[in-house]
């Protein structure tokens, strides 16, 4: 097929307009690059294909980090959310996480509007069927209608669209998601270029008609009052909140599900792709946990102006008649109507072990991958990768070094390091347990960790940056004040001393020492320190956490410092592991396969022993 060259060349071309593509395109354009975003359907920009929510455990951390770096996801959910909650409030600050229900259509429309208003960003509807590669470098992309777009860099954010195949029972048909065509040809070309292309599977529940649900028999779940925003730039959430509802499956539901397993593509061997371990279908739960007589579901509204509800935790690929029966077996849903059937989808992905930490591919220069093409699941994981790919493509255009976030700097850094160091054979989801320095990587300090980095690359506007500097200065000043202000036993309020078992106090205590006690909060401190009441809540929170967890934080910082040497030692491209005496054949094979960029990455490859890392370290030192 002959292609017509488009009459404009771009710095960055982004393929796909899901959550990864949106962040990638916005980042590149905001950094001054002429950017083109190509998508199969312009009306599906930032569409929430599965649950109508942003955030959750570890995912909320990712959104905060995206926002701190100058991304859009946090602002978008703040403007379109309909219920906001902080999870794990009874646990420590490291695992507290923000989550919000979204108005699904408003979320999509606002993101599309933001992108349409962005300077240097062009949006076009087209299906990309291949990339243009010359001399090992990407030069542009080809589209189904015969137009070739040329660009200095290309970012693939294809989601579930590459050879997407939708399953409902034993019926299947091509699709990128329900209602959209798949992308055909692109993954075949990637395979021909030498990429290891695999197959994954995910699924989504049915969408239920809220008019046919008896909510009086369900338990409502309300959001926090007042709602806490995601973005560090959002002052408050003004829109009214909407409740979710809790329901449960029962033994009858499970009998119905078992009766349909012979027509389940999952259990009939029709689906080849590997599904998400931590988001199993309801038939998977029933089979794997036969001792459980019920499973919880949250009925989540898809928006204010729609009757559609999303039953979380009830994804399935069972036949439609089994879907009708088992959804209607749930109390409160006896008369429920399905508006959109549940389905599973198989799609191609590219093993992320073939990427550098910048998300540039090792096989084709200037080509970047982000989102589900890398084997991840989740909007937030995709958005974090998209943001980093967009930043690094723009930096490549400027001929600057890439921005690489370390495991001690961000959950985004943990995620990307996991992907490019270990690869994945199943959909990867972020968890706080994946981060070894999670006390340093809290939601509340994402701006303190990353605002400087976002400003340095040009994504954080000057006004937002100045507000951040003022906040940081106030935190430092308050920490110094508390350290230098003392409570004298002779002058202290006797009631305060009695309340906290301090009546026997003989020596003065600083306010810092008082606040370090687990039973004394900032609120309590206000009883004896009028100035504490004047401290803004965001400063107060940060100061209290830093004081109460100081010992733990210092220990983790020591661990980071010890690991820094490994992370900073680069392994040259094409390094000959076969020439290293002392390495076992297994270690040589793994190092040659994974091709780590740094000594730190090498140390995290399964089977590479500390002794092998030591040998490699000595060899690198000898090379100078």
Curated annotation (Swiss-Prot):
It comes from the Bacteria. FAD binds at residues 16-21, 128, 183, 372. InterPro entries: FAD/NAD-bd_sf, GIDA_C_N, MnmG, MnmG-rel, MnmG-rel_CS, MnmG_C, MnmG_C_subdom, MnmG_C_subdom_sf. One of its GO terms (biological process) is tRNA methylation. Its main location: cytoplasm. It is found in: Cytoplasm. The keyword Cytoplasm applies. Pfam families: GIDA, GIDA_C_1st, SAM_GIDA_C. One of its GO terms (cellular component) is cytosol. GO terms for molecular function: flavin adenine dinucleotide binding. SMART domains: GIDA_assoc_3. PROSITE patterns: GIDA_1, GIDA_2. NAD(+) binds at residues 275-289. The keyword Protein transport does not apply. Its cofactor is FAD. Keywords: Cytoplasm, FAD, Flavoprotein, NAD, tRNA processing. Homodimer. Heterotetramer of two MnmE and two MnmG subunits. NAD-binding protein involved in the addition of a carboxymethylaminomethyl (cmnm) group at the wobble position (U34) of certain tRNAs, forming tRNA-cmnm(5)s(2)U34. PANTHER family: GLUCOSE INHIBITED DIVISION PROTEIN A, PROTEIN MTO1 HOMOLOG, MITOCHONDRIAL. Belongs to the MnmG family. This is tRNA uridine 5-carboxymethylaminomethyl modification enzyme MnmG. The lineage of its organism: Bacteria, Pseudomonadati, Thermodesulfobacteriota, Desulfuromonadia, Geobacterales.
């Amino acid at each position: 097929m002959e292609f017509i060259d488009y009459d404009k060349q771009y710095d960055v071309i982004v393929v796909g307009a899901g959550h990864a593509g949106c962040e990638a395109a916005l980042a590149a354009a905001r950094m001054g690059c002429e950017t083109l975003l190509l998508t199969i359907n312009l009306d599906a920009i930032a569409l929430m294909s599965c649950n109508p929510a942003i955030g959750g455990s570890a995912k909320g951390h990712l959104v905060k980090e995206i926002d701190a770096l100058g991304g859009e996801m946090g602002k978008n959910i703040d403007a379109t959310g309909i219920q906001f909650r902080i999870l794990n409030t009874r646990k420590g600050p490291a695992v507290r996480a923000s989550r919000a229900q979204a108005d699904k259509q408003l979320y999509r429309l606002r993101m599309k509007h933001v992108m349409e208003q962005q300077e240097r960003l062009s949006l076009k509807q087209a299906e990309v069927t291949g990339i243009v590669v010359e001399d090992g470098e990407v030069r542009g992309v080809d589209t189904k209608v015969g137009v070739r777009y040329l660009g200095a860099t290309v970012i693939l954010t294809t989601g579930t669209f590459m050879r997407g195949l939708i399953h409902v029972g034993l019926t299947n048909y091509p699709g990128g998601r329900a209602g959209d065509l798949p992308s055909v040809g692109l993954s075949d070309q990637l395979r021909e270029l030498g990429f290891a292309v695999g197959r994954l599977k995910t699924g989504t529940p049915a969408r239920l008609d809220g008019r046919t649900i008896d909510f009086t028999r369900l338990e409502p779940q309300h959001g926090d009052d007042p709602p806490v925003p995601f973005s560090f730039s959002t002052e408050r959430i003004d829109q009214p909140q909407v409740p979710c509802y809790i329901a449960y499956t029962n033994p009858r539901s499970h009998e119905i599900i078992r009766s349909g397993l012979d027509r389940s593509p999952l259990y009939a061997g029709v689906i080849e792709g590997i599904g998400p371990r931590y988001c199993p279908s309801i038939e998977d739960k029933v089979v794997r946990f036969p001792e459980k007589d019920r499973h919880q579901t949250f009925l989540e509204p898809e928006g204010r102006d729609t009757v559609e509800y999303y039953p979380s935790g009830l994804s399935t690929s069972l036949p439609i008649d089994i879907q009708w029966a088992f959804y209607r077996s749930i109390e409160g849903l006896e008369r429920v109507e399905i508006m959109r059937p549940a389905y599973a989808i198989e799609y191609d992905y590219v093993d992320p072990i073939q990427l550098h930490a910048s998300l540039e591919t090792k096989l084709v220069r200037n080509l970047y991958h982000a989102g589900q093409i890398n084997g991840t699941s989740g909007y937030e994981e995709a958005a974090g990768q998209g943001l980093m790919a967009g930043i690094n493509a723009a930096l490549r255009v400027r001929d600057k070094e890439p921005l690489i976030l370390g495991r001690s700097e961000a959950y985004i850094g943990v995620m990307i390091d996991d992907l490019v160091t270990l690869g994945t054979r199943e959909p990867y989801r972020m968890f706080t347990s994946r981060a070894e320095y999670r006390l340093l990587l809290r939601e509340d300090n994402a701006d303190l960790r990353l605002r400087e980095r976002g400003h340095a690359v040009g994504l954080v506007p000057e006004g937002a940056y100045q507000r951040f500097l003022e906040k940081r200065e106030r935190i430092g000043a308050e920490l110094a004040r508390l350290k230098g202000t003392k409570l004298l036993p002779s002058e202290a309020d006797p009631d305060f001393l009695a309340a906290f078992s301090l009546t026997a106090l003989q020596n003065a205590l600083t306010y810092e020492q008082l606040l370090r006690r687990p039973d004394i909060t900032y609120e309590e401190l206000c009883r004896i320190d009028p100035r504490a009441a004047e401290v803004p809540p965001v400063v107060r929170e940060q100061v209290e956490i830093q004081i109460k967890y100081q010992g733990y934080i210092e220990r983790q910082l020591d661990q980071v410092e010890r690991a820094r040497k490994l992370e900073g030692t680069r392994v040259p491209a094409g390094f000959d592991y076969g020439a290293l005496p002392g390495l076992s054949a297994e270690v040589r094979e793994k190092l040659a396969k994974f091709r780590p960029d740094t000594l730190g990455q090498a140390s995290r490859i399964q089977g590479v022993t500390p002794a092998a890392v030591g040998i490699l370290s000595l060899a690198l030192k000898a090379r100078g």
